[in-house]
């Protein structure tokens, strides 16, 4: 199933800040602080987590959502870590 327009937008918002980073996994906290916690795109943390879940189960190449050099595997690992940290924060 292709990624919904809303989820694609949320994923773009999460990828954009790390497109030039050498290792996106090192930027997870920064992105959560600047994108998720500020409710960028009027989305709640749960909406971001849901969008990530949808993205990770889709067959779409997530690395193609915005022009950048990271592999699809790197982007998927990064998004999985963002989702994990959102979940940890929501459980506290």
For each feature predicted by the language model, list its residue ranges:
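Amphipathic alpha-helical binding modules
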Residues: 64-92
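Short terminal alpha-helical segments
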Residues: 1-33, 83
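Alpha-helix boundary/N-cap detector
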Residues: 2, 23-26, 43, 47, ...
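Extended alpha-helical scaffolding segments
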Residues: 31-72
């Amino acid at each position: 199933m292709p990624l919904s327009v809303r989820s694609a937008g949320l994923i773009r918002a999460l990828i954009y800040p790390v497109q030039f980073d050498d290792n996106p996994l090192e930027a997870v906290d920064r992105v959560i602080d600047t994108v998720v916690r500020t409710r960028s795109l009027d989305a709640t943390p749960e909406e971001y987590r849901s969008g990530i879940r949808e993205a990770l189960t889709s067959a779409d190449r997530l690395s193609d959502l915005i022009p950048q050099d990271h592999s699809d595997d790197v982007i998927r690992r990064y998004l999985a870590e963002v989702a994990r940290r959102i979940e940890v924060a929501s459980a506290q």
